[in-house]
């Protein structure tokens, strides 16, 4: 769609929009920057693109001043975030991540509030190897950050019941369906044993992003799947939510919520926290289709002129829920069902032991600040 302001003129787009459009589907000059050993940093525009690859450029703030006095560039390093729908990983993947944080990062494994891993303190020369090792462990970092759908949250213990396991598979399906289609990630970060670029398909032409388009979303997009009575994913704080509707011990579908988000900028009335609205109901088979059409509606109508006003919650607040539902249903080609009732009786993590339906016990631990690190005060 073409953006217009009240005067009929096309408004000025946010800088990130021009960076994305000129990036050749998230390539930019990242590959060239990785080869430049004259600096520990990447080009400024490329640091906006690496977010889509799950990577943030950072520097050590504690020594900025002394490095500036010594006429040295900042002590640059990188954080990489590992996307894991529902936060579910195998024991071997956990051990691998523990090894990676010691071998390539600063020794601390971070567990995020959105159920992802983070490694901090990776220097540029180790960045590509770290990403390859993560992928060798059957995990990835693509779409863990950036203006796309990010890690899809779900109940943290899929072994709790058959229904929880089913919900995790739905979260994984949403994540896979909304993953960017660009081959840039594989081209830049992954090579075979001969140093050749890996290709996931044999040179399909032309390359395109069928869901996101070449400028992706106006802003980040967060999704979650909840299994009542637990609202452990803070469903109403997400752009998109699916609440399992359970009848006769079966998930018969999902009540869909849209437009949540707790972020705001103080002193700016145009930004505010907002709880999600209930949009309707869909069957399990319709989940990825519904998710896609909600994302493409935000892609086309979200605010690309002001990143502080670019989340889905503002699109719905400005245009109305009825308009949004109509636009989504027009793209679906069918109407959403009447929302089914559900009830949450708690939120947050339930620490301690929980028994599953097979009689096994599972322990949820409190991890202070999400940091897994061996210290003298608390050796691990």
Regions found by a protein language model. Name each.
Residues 1-380:
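Peripheral terminal and linker regions in Fe-S/redox and tRNA-modifying enzymes
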């Amino acid at each position: 769609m073409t953006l217009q302001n009240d005067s009929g003129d096309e408004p000025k787009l946010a800088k990130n929009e021009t960076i994305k459009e000129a990036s050749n589907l998230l390539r930019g000059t990242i590959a060239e920057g990785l080869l430049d050993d004259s600096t520990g940093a990447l080009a400024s525009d490329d640091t906006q693109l690496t977010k889509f690859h799950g990577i943030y450029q950072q520097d050590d703030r504690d020594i900025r001043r002394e490095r500036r006095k010594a006429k040295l560039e900042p002590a640059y390093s990188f954080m990489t975030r590992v996307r894991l729908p529902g936060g579910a990983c195998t024991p071997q993947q956990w051990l691998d991540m523990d090894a990676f944080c010691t071998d390539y990062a600063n020794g601390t494994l971070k567990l995020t509030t959105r159920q992802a891993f983070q490694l901090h303190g990776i220097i540029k020369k180790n960045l590509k190897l770290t990403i390859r090792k993560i992928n060798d462990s059957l995990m990835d970092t693509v779409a863990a950050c950036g203006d796309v759908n990010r890690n899809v949250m779900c109940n943290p213990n899929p072994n709790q019941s058959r229904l929880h396991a089913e919900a995790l598979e739905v979260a994984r399906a949403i994540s896979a369906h909304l993953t960017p289609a660009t081959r840039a990630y594989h081209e830049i970060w992954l090579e075979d044993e001969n140093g050749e670029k890996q290709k996931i398909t044999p040179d399909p032409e032309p390359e395109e992003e069928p869901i996101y388009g070449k400028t992706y979303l106006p802003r980040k997009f967060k999704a979650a799947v909840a299994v009542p009575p637990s609202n452990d994913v803070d469903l109403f704080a997400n752009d998109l939510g699916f609440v399992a509707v359970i009848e006769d011990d079966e998930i018969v579908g999902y009540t869909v919520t849209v437009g949540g988000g707790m972020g705001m900028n103080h002193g700016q009335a145009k930004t505010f926290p907002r709880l999600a609205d209930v949009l309707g109901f869909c069957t399990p088979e319709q989940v990825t289709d519904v998710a896609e059409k909600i994302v493409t509606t935000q892609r086309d109508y979200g605010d690309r002129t002001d990143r502080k006003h670019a989340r889905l919650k503002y699109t719905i607040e400005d245009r109305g829920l009825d308009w949004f539902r109509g636009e989504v249903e027009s793209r679906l080609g069918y109407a959403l069902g009447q929302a089914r009732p559900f009830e949450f009786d708690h939120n947050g993590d339930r620490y301690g032991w929980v028994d599953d339906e097979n009689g096994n016990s599972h322990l949820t631990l409190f991890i202070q600040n999400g940091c897994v690190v061996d210290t003298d005060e608390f050796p691990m």
